[in-house]
């Protein structure tokens, strides 16, 4: 129980960065040469001490060819079912909690419009604060109903705040990575 509580808090604790953890999301299609080339240009700027996780054959090939520290590679089908993404996220969270790397970042191609896709790297962990995380969720899914927000009754959380925080942060990271995978496949 306290271990879960600690893992929830670990997602918010900033620690000295010895190793960045970078998830690289590439396309598998051969006709997207510039898309992957631009993404790999951004990945190439990441310092050599970083540890990488790849989603997509092209990312795996690139990271192997450039002799980067590739911890794992995953394949996510075109439909990107959440069950496939869950394996990736659970691996990343485990590596982060075991302190094999001190950040979780995602290198992906951001879809601007059909003619413009921008490669970028976003940091997911550690979280800056809970308010930022909630604001992101509200922006994506809408704010809670005002009547619910005004309810001042005290709520007893079971199993406990620590477990809920750990689950909430884990779900948030899963949802964010899932969204980035969908966006990079657009």
Predicted features by range, described:
Residues 1-186:
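C-terminal beta-strand-loop-alpha-helix "lid" module of Rossmann-like NAD(P)-dependent dehydrogenases
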